[in-house]
Amino acid sequence: YKRQEVGVIDILVNNAGIIKRIPMCDMTADEFRQVVDVDLNAPFIVSKAVIPSMIKKGHGKIINICSMMSELGRETVSAYAAAKGGLKMLTRNICSEYGEYNIQCNGIGPGYIATPQTAPLREKQPDGSRHPFDQFIISKTPAARWGNPEDLQGPAAFLALSLIHI
């Protein structure tokens, strides 16, 4: 980033993410790299760029949007699960390396969120029924719905508060 254009960053939210739903043995190395580049390498690069100014100021907050896929695997999302698992560990590592400088790094690991990435799993079937995975999510979620991107605003805002030191 160009510091003169955006100024000093106190709070960084690494929220970019992509997914390619391809069985691992059908996925090319380039497709795997594309997912890892966006979901893991980009947060590393951006965090690395802002941490020195956070150290200089004596504080900073980094919030990484991870995924429940950092904890479990599922068919056709090997690159995504690997990248989000790596992001979870990068989050922990940033805490270990830079916590002494009052830089807090937290990860939010949401479940399934209704985004363009999950649209294929929410589409109605030709017979009008729900996609089997959509039925599964609805039946296993206490709110009986997919999460919305707005659902992440509260946790992110909480973690960004200056009073919070976790």
What are these model-derived regions, one by one?
Residues S47, A83, T91:
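Active-site helix of classical SDR
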Residues P52, S96-E100:
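Alpha-helical segment proximal to the catalytic Tyr-Lys
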Residues P23-M24, E31-V36, I137:
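Substrate-binding pocket helix/loop in short-chain dehydrogenase/reductase
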